[in-house]
Regions:
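OB-fold single-stranded nucleic acid-binding module
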Residues: 23-33, 49-50, 56-106
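Short, glycine/small-residue-enriched coil/turn segments at secondary-structure junctions
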Residues: 3-16
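Short secondary-structure boundary/capping segments within folded domains
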Residues: 7, 31-32, 41-42
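Short beta-strand-initiation
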Residues: 1, 35-37
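Beta-strand secondary-structure signal
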Residues: 14-16, 39-41, 50, 68-70
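Short structured motifs
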Residues: 1-4, 53-55
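Short, acidic/hydrophobic/Gly-rich beta-strand patch recurrent on exposed beta strands
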Residues: 38-44, 82-86
Length: 106
């Protein structure tokens, strides 16, 4: 699914894109106790979307990586939609640091 096709309250979303920005992890209190979360901006050829990475997911992907996301759900926060990956969902790095690869191809 392309990013511009993603709408609020969708479930079981599968998409892919390049991580173009990533925040430093921060601690938040959840109903499961304190957890770490980082926000990333995911981009494809149709647009961008915010994505929350929790705990172990944070170290899986970095700026420049192209990732595949499966089983995500969509929420709306401050009038912007964002992807969330539940425990049953996955994020997989398809190409590690595509920026370096682009440079090598030149």
């Amino acid at each position: 699914m392309k990013i511009n096709e993603i709408k609020p309250r969708m479930n079981n979303v599968e998409t892919a894109g390049k991580i173009i920005a990533k925040s430093e992890p921060r601690r938040v209190d959840t109903r499961y106790g304190p957890r770490s979360v980082a926000d990333v901006k995911l981009e494809d050829d149709t647009g961008t979307i915010n994505l929350s990475l929790w705990e172990q997911q944070i170290d899986l992907a970095n700026v420049g990586d192209i990732v595949s996301i499966k089983g995500a759900y969509v929420t709306e926060y401050r009038n912007e939609i964002q992807l969330n990956i539940p425990r049953s969902g996955t994020i997989e790095v398809v190409i590690k640091d595509s920026n370096k690869q682009d440079i090598l191809e030149l």
